[in-house]
Amino acid sequence: MTGAPARAAASPGADEEAASQARLTAEFEALLAEGETVEPRDWMPDGYRRMLIRQIAQHAHSEIIGMQPEGAWLSRAPSLHRKSVLLAKVQDEAGHGLYLYSAAETLGVDRAELLAALHRGQQRYAATFNHPALTWADTGAVAWLTDGAAVINQAPLCHTSYGPYARAMRRVCQEEAFHVRQGYDLMKALCEGTPAQKAMAQDAVDRWWLPAVALMFGPPDTEAAGGDAKTAALGAAVSRRAIAWGIKRHTNDELRQRFVDHCVPQAERLGLTLPDPGIRWNEERGHYDFGPVDWELYRGALGDDTHTARQRLAHRVAAHEDGAWVREAAAAYAARQSGADTAGTSTEAVA
């Protein structure tokens, strides 16, 4: 009995399909090389689509979950003015999530699927928001530091290669920049207040600085930036592919450096001390040096299995379930309107 051939001959159809895929991929790469924008109806590699869905979904989830730390202080704001400013900010974050879910839907995925995956713990959000907001000063630190990191991280996305994402980010970044100014203004007011108020501001910075530096920019791209070999290899691989496709414009470590360079002078003007003894100006590099991040510590302290993380997700699921009647009513209204429009069109056609 003779053995079966090790590999069956490729069918002509398979060869044609492979050639077609190669041609489309080459055209796609050429489009990106020319700096053109990819639109929903354009052909794109499956890997590009998957990476975009993953990134946009995580971004949208982070906006929605990120409402919680500050939202908890709405009923305890010290004045009507501060309450109205914080309320507007929290509403903006909800709007950002909606813009981004809409951008994700242009890639052929439904936002209900994305939210269901989040609620099941199958998709992630920025672990920074697993950090508890313990005092009123935390609302200022979150806006100044976390939103400040978001602006630096997201501003290049206004020129990302996928059109709907880039257009959504232009609106998001304009509003996030305002949030940063609002947070800095609150920190300035506290620092110019009583000694107790300034101490509260310093305490908030002590707790929010490293989560912003560590978690808002993703894993390090090199071991020199503080990552172990496995973490650095993962960060570098993801960054290389995302940059090659024009989804990202800069590495995680480049963005992290920009954030530190931006915040150190601001902290000095406020009279606050950033909790990193390694921060010092490096004349040769033209940047501030800063200490390594203990990634294992932050994985444990702000991971998915902490009490605050479970609380954040449970609150999100409860809010989603409580709002089911609103979604059902909106869907029913849209269906009726669609039926009325169809009936009107049919009548006009008969006439």
Model-inferred region functions:
Residues Y48-H59, A77-H96, T139, P164-E176:
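Alpha-helical scaffold segments that form or flank carboxylate-/histidine-based iron centers
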Residues D42-Y48, G66-A88, A149-Y165:
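Helix-loop segments that flank and shape redox-cofactor active sites
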Residues F129-Q182:
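Internal, conserved structured core segments that host functional sites
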Residues M1-M44, Y48, E321-A351:
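Extreme N-terminal leader/anchor segments
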Residues A199-A351:
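Extended, helix-rich structural scaffolds rather than catalytic motifs
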Residues T37-A57, A117-A143, T160, G193-Q197, ...:
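Acidic/His metal-coordination segments adjacent to aromatic residues that form catalytic metal sites
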Residues T160-P211:
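Glycine- and acidic-residue-rich phosphate-binding/metal-coordinating active-site segment common to enzymes
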Residues G13-T25, K89-A117, G183-M187:
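Conserved alpha-helical segments that form or flank metal/cofactor-binding pockets of metalloenzymes
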